[in-house]
Amino acid sequence: GVMYIGNNKGLLEFDGNSWELHELPSRNIVRSVYIGKDGKIFVGSFEEFGYFERNSLDSLVYHSLKDEVKDFQFHNDEIWTITSAHGEIVFQSFGSLFFYDGHTVKGIRTKTLPLNLFQVGDTVYSQQINGGLFILAKNGLENLIERKSLGNSDVVAGLPYNDGVLFLTQKSGGFVYQSGKILKWHTECDAELEKYSVNRAVMTKDSCYIIGTLSNGIYAIDKKGRLLWKENTDSRLQNNTILGLYCDADNNVWAALDEGIAYIQNNSLVYYYEPPYRKIGMVYDVLVKEDEAYIASNQGLYRIRNRVPELVPGLEEQAWFVGEWGKQILCGHNK
């Protein structure tokens, strides 16, 4: 098969032997990728979305759908998720939903702010920013579960669990939703998942839950909550921030990291395309002073004294900026 991966340069295509980059006309970042049943490769970017399709020469050609949206004013709409629902392709930004039926595109501003979209079976769910969990019905978003019932945390993934659904939250672990009831899903690593912030999750064909975190790599957990394995920069991962996960037809796991890609052969070794070990993470900004330095990275804000980096307490996870204002150190942080 062929893998398609979005990155800062465009759409990457990997056939098992070689990589090929397909740029958008705007050369913007590709934030989201979805393969339609008709083979079209849908992609989302900043105020841009559309699809790649092969021509008669077997080359991928991009078709924009943005200009097909009528009576809609774009305003910083970045497409973070693409899925299908009720026979349509759905593109999601933090304030809008766009529906493509194969011919026309309709854009709507949502009353609440969708953080994501994810599909379990035939149902599409959507976590709302600072709100509860909704389902995407034919007539729009409908409230399903109040935020307080899910640990007052954002649901970042939903996966099949027996006859129900396992919802994984960013900071409060997992919850099983079945027959209208919600039960806590207990694991051997609940404390770690809550500490390191769950960001993505997929399920393998042998019902293993692969859970990616923002600051401590990947956990593999079975249905009973037993930890099967864990990978981070202390073992073999080159980066601890997991931005995407995918289980392929051979039951292998692909992880999109903040810096590079990891390929995990199930029950085997991990192979990397960018192998350097950097526990401090991907550096976004640096502030140098006389006797110390500060580094803002995807793992947090670090203070370096005598060549020893120390994570500043309370500023774990992604730190985007560090600067000095008078005698104060300012940090732009994901929190």
Protein language model regions, located:
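Carboxylate-rich, polar loop motifs that coordinate divalent cations or form catalytic acidic clusters
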Residues: 1-335
